[in-house]
Regions:
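Active-site-adjacent loop/helix segments that line or gate small-molecule/cofactor pockets in enzymes
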Residues: 1-47
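Short beta-strands and strand-loop turn motifs
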Residues: 3, 62-65, 205-211
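Short, hydrophobic/aliphatic alpha-helical segments
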Residues: 14-22, 52-59, 109-110
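Active-site and channel-lining beta-strand-loop segments
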Residues: 42-63
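Solvent-exposed alpha-helices and their adjacent loops that cap or buttress functional pockets
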Residues: 45-46, 109-113, 136-139, 173-178, ...
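Glycine-rich loop-to-alpha-helix module at the N-terminal edge of alpha/beta enzyme cores
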Residues: 60-141
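Conserved PLP-anchoring active-site segment centered on the Schiff-base-forming lysine
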Residues: 137-158
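PLP-dependent aminotransferase-class I/II
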Residues: 151-211
Length: 212
């Protein structure tokens, strides 16, 4: 039963429970990322290597999350670790241009045929915010199409229709006139997208989460 599972979980993870209680005193909801809001509490991970993670109580887990999908080579891959250590030895924050950003941009362009130029940002939220602003500036149009449940960050245009408010109404703290310019469509429904585009001449962009 669920109670037996939760009981076994608590028995094996007292360190995570203690840290969770401490976190609730200093972090909103006791977490630093919404995906870690779990009941009765989330695990606290101490180390990781390859496909495995270990919590603060020494329990080992197979990691199917992979750093939100970013760790294609697993945790602590020797070549990645060596490269990071080498880079840290040269400095941590230059506040200036760096040769590797040119090398990196060329690598992205070579890997993605449709890309002509690359703009690096500090987060996915910042990237999608700037992309939508650019699309509106270029087209002179206002609205954009989003797929329900697709995640594109946490700015105001992206909260409606991700985990709730699938009717397009504004989530708490978001202005109604922002939500009204977001058109939500069902994932994988090409006919619905075509219908919206055909019936509304004020569409600046369609945004898609490729892995959604």
């Amino acid at each position: 039963s669920n109670s037996q599972i939760i009981g076994a979980y608590r028995e094996k993870t007292p360190g995570s429970e203690k840290l969770s209680m401490e976190a609730n005193e200093v972090l909103p909801s006791g977490i630093a990322h919404d995906s870690r809001y779990l009941k009765p509490y989330a695990l606290y991970i101490d180390k990781a290597e390859g496909p495995h993670k270990w919590d603060v109580d020494g329990n080992r887990y197979v990691d199917y999350f992979g750093g939100h999908g970013a760790l294609l080579l697993g945790h602590c891959h020797p070549e990645v670790t060596e490269a990071v250590q080498s880079a840290l030895g040269a400095g941590t924050q230059f506040g200036a241009n760096h040769p590797r950003e040119v090398e990196w941009a060329n690598q992205v362009i070579n890997m993605v045929p449709s890309v002509e130029r690359v703009r690096f940002t500090s987060s996915g939220t910042e990237a999608t915010l700037m992309a939508l602003r650019l699309s509106r500036s270029f087209t002179g149009k206002t609205k954009f199409i989003r797929f329900k449940t697709h995640f594109h960050g946490w700015h105001d245009h992206m909260t409606t229709g991700y985990a709730n408010h699938f009717d397009g109404t504004a989530t708490a703290g978001v202005l109604d006139n922002i939500a009204s310019n977001v058109i939500l469509v069902s994932p994988q429904d090409i006919s619905e997208i075509k219908s919206v585009i055909a019936s509304d001449d004020d569409i600046a962009a369609v945004i898609v989460e490729p892995t959604g």
